[in-house]
């Protein structure tokens, strides 16, 4: 009996990439491969790549160089680059790393088995053409047994001037509601408690599907999808990401308030707190529009948590315009902001814009914004002190094996004493005893805590 071939996947970038990696891992295991913790022990190495920022892209090339050297010594090694760098670079990757066997864009993740068959037949394969994304019936190899990603829409039709995503992930393609519900029902049967609906621009869900209502709305929207999946037995929590302010609606907020399984957490990038910068970014909304969304959320769901993304030092951004971003962060009081200094990406209009800012300015503004974000997050955390929060226990605290960790409905990370063997996958009441900017510590109040 032959020894099973081993595979290793390294994933860079966003939640969409993580979900794609889980699907590709499932395909490989369906083909008989087994997981290897170490890339150097694997017979197949796959890098699922991100090109949103230059440093992530350069890290990929560093990893690839090491595996290319290994393949020269071990010709049977299968070397694959998937994801956004693969889509962006295409055949030029083969010139840069001729040891590669397969270059495949994100739209081809579900076709990995077919593409591998071509590789095994002796071909060096580049799969970056735009295709209809096929439904995948293979079981993903998910990183968690408690929470799961569920892709509902692929691609993006927006044309933000700094962003390469539409170029590498293609046009928007929504999955049918019935297929999404079927996947969630399967997850529930496997014991999953929480699902996160994923889309690069999830508020665009359904606008490419046929049909409209008598009122002129799209027949299928994210709001309608939440109602479609909400009653799946066994699923206790529903989240979604990432929202776009241009398409975010009050109807969606009211649905979230009405549906008890939908968590009180919204991730809505604002990117800049200055209208002129937003216009240069082609974001399609104003600061005032963003603040109205925040106001609506807090009017309808007062305890909701709001997180965001922000970019500093966009080409031509003045000190005054940057300070407008600081003002917005202070005014909203976000629970979390993912921050980044602007990084020019090939093929985007902003990369060729005049007035590119220096690295010194970028790092100064990033540091100042991060300081304010942490301060605001610490202030927001204070409201949890002494409260009892429902926490879904997911794992052992990697820094303290005597503790478990999980998340509140508002997505705050919580640590508490206990053993994962007893608590994994449980929704437990936790009294919060300590707060920090981005995490909480508490004490489990349920009877199960007595055995911890």
Curated annotation (Swiss-Prot):
User: What reaction is this protein's catalytic activity?
Assistant: N(6)-dimethylallyladenosine(37) in tRNA + (sulfur carrier)-SH + AH2 + 2 S-adenosyl-L-methionine = 2-methylsulfanyl-N(6)-dimethylallyladenosine(37) in tRNA + (sulfur carrier)-H + 5'-deoxyadenosine + L-methionine + A + S-adenosyl-L-homocysteine + 2 H(+)
Q: What is the lineage of its organism?
A: Bacteria, Bacillati, Cyanobacteriota, Cyanophyceae, Synechococcales
Q: Where does [4Fe-4S] cluster 2 bind?
A: 156, 160, 163
Q: How is the cofactor bound?
A: Binds 2 [4Fe-4S] clusters. One cluster is coordinated with 3 cysteines and an exchangeable S-adenosyl-L-methionine.
Q: Where is the MTTase N-terminal domain?
A: 5-121
Work out whether the entry's keyword set contains Ubl conjugation: no
Q: What is this protein called?
A: tRNA-2-methylthio-N(6)-dimethylallyladenosine synthase
Give the EC number(s) listed in the UniProt record.
Answer: 2.8.4.3
Gene3D superfamilies in the record, alphabetically?
Answer: Methylthiotransferase, N-terminal domain (3.40.50.12160), tm_1862 like domain (3.80.30.20)
Q: What organism, scientifically named, is this protein from?
A: Synechococcus elongatus (strain ATCC 33912 / PCC 7942 / FACHB-805) (Anacystis nidulans R2)
Alphabetized, the UniProt keywords read:
4Fe-4S, Cytoplasm, Iron, Iron-sulfur, Metal-binding, S-adenosyl-L-methionine, Transferase, tRNA processing
Its annotated function is as follows:
Catalyzes the methylthiolation of N6-(dimethylallyl)adenosine (i(6)A), leading to the formation of 2-methylthio-N6-(dimethylallyl)adenosine (ms(2)i(6)A) at position 37 in tRNAs that read codons beginning with uridine.
Stored HAMAP family = tRNA_metthiotr_MiaB
